[in-house]
Amino acid sequence: MPTNCAAAGCAATYNKHINISFHRFPLDPKRRKEWVRLVRRKNFVPGKHTFLCSKHFEASCFDLTGQTRRLKMDAVPTIFDFCTHIKSLKLKSRNLLKTNNSFPPTGPCNLKLNGSQQVLLEHSYAFRNPMEAKKRIIKLEKEIASLRKKMKTCLQRERRATRRWIKATCFVKSLEASNMLPKGISEQILPTALSNLPLEDLKSLEQDQQDKTVPIL
């Protein structure tokens, strides 16, 4: 005979002196699957000795024509107190947490740690184990070093571009002062032409202008 009910949170146990009957899960795969779905137990697989008690069925689900209480062929369990079961699980979880917190910490707590070790301890809860956290830290340190290198390269390029612009501006101004370029032309051409002119081209232009002896009138 069955010993207890398989429904979550149900404490019904077989006793011939109480008016509760127990019923096996259907053998028909479709009906059996529907029962399992309604029971709503995670990873639940009923066996041949798995039962539900009569408290989970409506009165219309029973065939009372004989001497024993039997379920009709289309009967499905629809009466469950899931709220009580969830509250019970939460209560057990809180009690377990209180029990774990009641144990005093063991081992020395005043060890001096370096920066990487401190970060490892503070954030190791996000990883499965400390070694995984340490590998993650090493990877992040490499990424930071790579970004710093790229930043340094960008700054160097920016400084070179600034120096090139200053040299180009001074060169055009000198040509303008020596009447090799019309007055005021620098304000027109510098913002557009010289910004994209390579330094090598400026040097070539400077050499060409030095070879000229006749100024522009």
Swiss-Prot record:
GO MF term (any one): DNA binding
Signal peptide limits: none
Intervals of motif HCFC1-binding motif (HBM): 122-125
PROSITE patterns: ZF_THAP
Matches recorded under Pfam families: THAP
This protein's UniProt keywords: DNA-binding, Metal-binding, Zinc, Zinc-finger
Residues in THAP-type zinc fingers: 1-80
GO CC terms of this entry: nucleolus
PANTHER family with a match to the protein in the record: THAP DOMAIN-CONTAINING PROTEIN 2 (PTHR47696:SF1)
Name recorded for this polypeptide: THAP domain-containing protein 2
